[in-house]
Amino acid sequence: MLVTFSIVAPIFNELDNLPELYRRVREVMSAAGATWELVLVDDGSTDGSTDAILQLAKRDKHVRPVIFARNFGHQVAITAGWDFARGEAVVIIDADL
C-alpha cells in the first residue's frame, strides 16, 4: 500500500494520552482522505504504553509499532520512526498533543 503521510510519535510513558492521540490522528487523516500510517515509537515505557500500542496495532492496520527494550531518548525515537516511516511525507508529533 502506498502511504501518503506517516505520522511519527515518540512515546515514553504516555499511556493516558495514547487514546486521544490515536483518536485525533485518525479523525484528521480520515477527513483528509489520504492514505496514512501512525508510527508509534515506544521508547522503553514502563507504564503500560507498550501493551496499549500493540493492542492499537492489532485493531488498526494504520498503526505501526516500533518498540525499544529500553529508553534511548527522544531524538533516537524520532530517528527510528523516520527510518520505519513509509510515507511520502513524514510528520513528527508529540504524544501529549
Task: Name what the model sees in each region.
Residues 1-97:
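Structured catalytic core of nucleotide-sugar glycosyltransferases
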